[in-house]
Amino acid sequence: ARAEGRSPLVMAARNCHRTFVFAAAMLDFDVCWLCPPAKGSYLACKITPALLDSALGAAEKKPDAVYITSPDYLGNVADIAGLAEVCHRHGVLLAVDNAHGAYLRFLPVSRHPIDLGADICCDSAHKTLPVLTGGAYLHISNNAPALFAAEARRALALFGSTSPSYLILESLDAANRELAGDFPARLADMAERTSALRQRLSAYGFAVIGDEP
C-alpha cells in the first residue's frame, strides 16, 4: 500500500484491544470497523464468515487485511478457517489477535489460527501458558507473502527493546520444553473436564457464555 502511495486499510472487528487503535494512530493506517449484530445480547458477538463476506463485497475500498480477535474476551472462538477462506477469496490477508489462545495449537485437533489459514497472528503466551508476563509468540504462515518475515524483523527491531528481559526469554524456552512434553495430554484432559462442567451448568439453568475449549 505504501509503495502505491496510499495509507494501508485494515478492516477490523470492533472488539479489538486498544493497542490496535494505538498502532493505527502510530503507523498511520486507516481502519474500517466490522461490527456484528448484537442478536439480542448486550455482549459482543462473533464475526462470522457470512458477515465478513458481505462486508468485503460491499466495501468501497478493498482493505489490505482483516483483523480479528479470537478468542475474544468472553471466550468466543471465531470460525478462523471460514474467515481465512473468505479473506483469501477476496485477495485480502487475515491477521488474528490470538492473545488468549496460545494453547489452541496443542489440543487433540489444533484450532490455532495459523493451522486454520490465518496469515499472521500473535499469541500472548503468558495468558494461557506457563510464561512470565510479557512473553509472546509472533507466528507468520508459510503461505503469507515472502516479505512478511523480513518486515516483521524490521518492525520488531523498531519497537522492541535492545535490552530484552532474559527472564521472560528463559520462561518462553521453559514453556517450549513443557509443550514438547506431556502438556497436550494434560490439556486434553482439562478440556474434557471443562466441557463436562459447561454441560452441568447449562443443565442447572445457567447461561454459559463462550465456546472456548
Residue ranges with predicted function:
Residues 1-210:
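Conserved PLP-enzyme active-site core in the AAT-like
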